[in-house]
């Protein structure tokens, strides 16, 4: 286990390795193969921290061959934050989504969603067609506005491991998965977002030991609670389009554990730009097949229904 001093010393190396990645161009999504049905529910627009309008995102989903698509706004938080939606943006977002549902009826099914953070008020689960439940923060220290974000940057990860956990990455993982487990207590949150988000930067600079018994116990305890609550787990390609990873969340061993539990899964891009709405969907599908999955689950406007991976 790396100590605090060692983690701090890693910072310059991390910045050197990742520095050019921050401005990397998004990977372009692949075209749909073989006429298969596709859906993306995790996509952010200019109503929170996205770069494209909802209509631009919907048009991109149409161009990618999708039969349905959801645009998800980040839930407002009870403290200042740079990426969450402001409370006053929710009503205009819902109004725009109603307009798009009508405008694109018969061409693509359009859904209004929310990515609900476990630190947000549960009222933000109510006015949407569906909800993705996620954990982004580690509740350490007394001021929620100063809670570290697990997916901010490699240097932030170095700092919170050193300063908040004295270099104990397993303790940080236990804290994260305890937060994510709270999604099980939110019935309106049907989907679990990026299950192991804290591993975002681990391909080039390993911060977390996923083989550690403590790490695995924390992850599996959260998984069991979420599976028991009937949640759908997303296979999220967002870190691929941002240049941080070459494989989706969650890690393969987690997918294998989900398969053993007969968990439901869906594929999503966590896109923040119209160019990435279907990034690496084919790769995610092949990974699921390799892990033994035969079905993915798609939202039909009322509930999640099965779709065969192989047509």
Protein language model regions, located:
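An N-terminally biased module of ancient metal coordination in phosphate/nucleic-acid-related enzymes
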Residues: 11-13, 33-118, 199-214, 262, ...
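Conserved, mostly hydrophobic/aromatic
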Residues: 42, 61, 131, 194, ...
